[in-house]
Amino acid sequence: MEAMSRPGADAAERLAALGVVPMAPGLSDDEVARIESSFAFTFADDHREFLAACLPVGEGWPNWREAGRRTLETLLRLPVDGILFAVEWKQFWDASWGRRPARMKDALRSAAYQLARVPRLVPVHSNCYLPAGHDSSGHPVLSIYQADIHVVAADLFDYVDRLTTPAAEPSAVATVDFWSDHVR
């Protein structure tokens, strides 16, 4: 009988084996529930599995157990805040939002309204994110800096593997609404 695939747990085991980041015990179900309730999102299934198996606590890894609320809120807001920065300073505008308002404050208000409706992204490490959402897994990991969005790994396991192993660019296609439309 073939073992059931557990991509998040496999990624956690791989990260632990690499020994490149300090690890704390994984998050309990109660801790995950508290985080999801406090910040109004749900982890993707593989991300939840990963964090239940281990909690990376090194530089750039969000410490979901000990980081302050403000720190975690900032990390969760960064993708949207980056897009708003690009709207204000780099003339970014998504075609699906309709015509761009002439006044900047109106453009920012409209963009913020639209961005409140796009899928939420959850930090994995540094500027790399996975989409939120229970009953989902296997999404490519996205690197996001303002409106500069790239697929950096085919999935969470591939991301962990790439931390120490140079590899060709992933051939995965981003799978999350809005954010996928702006992958370069």
Where are these regions (language model features)?
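Glycine-rich, aromatic-bearing surface loops/beta-hairpins
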Residues: 136-183
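A surface-exposed partner-binding patch
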Residues: 1-116, 122, 126
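Residues in flexible loops and secondary-structure boundaries
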Residues: 49-51, 132, 150-152
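Acidic, serine/threonine- and proline-rich low-complexity regulatory tracts
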Residues: 126, 131-133
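A short acidic (Asp/Glu
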Residues: 35, 134-135
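A generic structural signal for short, non-catalytic loop/turn and secondary-structure boundary residues
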Residues: 114-117, 135-137
